[in-house]
């Protein structure tokens, strides 16, 4: 999704990678469910009924909206940029961390929903107030990023910069 449009709309990009991390416990549980077929989307017969294991599993899992009060820890969303500026090799890490419990206190939801909703609201606000307005259809990276980045700071998702971050392959 995001990486496809970024590669098209930002000149000079040679490589984009997207990744997420999960706890060992989460991955172990997911692997166990996968091993017993519960993540399958292929229909199976159960009690004379055809069911899809993943859909059945969904009925047993807690409603995601109920997870907010007990979700703990922080999110970390960031971009690492590697390239040349004025002929010199540069590395820059721009990131935000967001605390699940603080988000729940503020809006009754955990940080994953918060970090999804706030940027969408900011984008809509910039379109509505005319900051991001021109004829046609555009992706956000095709607009001036400064108003968006400033608004992230104002609306609860402050970002930080780390110059010369340590990179992990």
PLM region descriptions:
Residues 1-169:
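C-terminal catalytic/substrate-binding lobe primarily of soluble NAD(P)-dependent oxidoreductases
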């Amino acid at each position: 999704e995001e990486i496809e449009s970024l590669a098209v709309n930002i000149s000079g990009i040679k490589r984009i990678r997207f990744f997420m991390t999960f706890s060992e416990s989460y991955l172990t549980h997911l692997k166990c469910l996968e091993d017993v077929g519960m993540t399958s989307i292929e229909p199976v017969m159960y009690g004379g009924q055809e069911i899809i294991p993943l859909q059945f599993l969904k009925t047993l899992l807690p409603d995601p909206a109920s997870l907010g009060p007990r979700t703990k820890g922080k999110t970390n969303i960031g971009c690492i940029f590697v390239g040349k500026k004025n002929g010199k090799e540069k590395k820059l890490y721009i990131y935000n961390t967001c605390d699940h419990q603080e988000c729940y206190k503020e809006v009754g939801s955990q940080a994953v929903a918060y970090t999804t909703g706030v940027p969408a609201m900011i984008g809509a606000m910039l379109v509505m107030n005319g900051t991001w307005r021109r004829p046609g259809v555009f992706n956000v990276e095709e607009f001036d990023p400064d108003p968006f980045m400033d608004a992230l700071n104002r609306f609860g998702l402050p970002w930080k910069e780390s110059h010369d971050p340590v990179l992990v392959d």
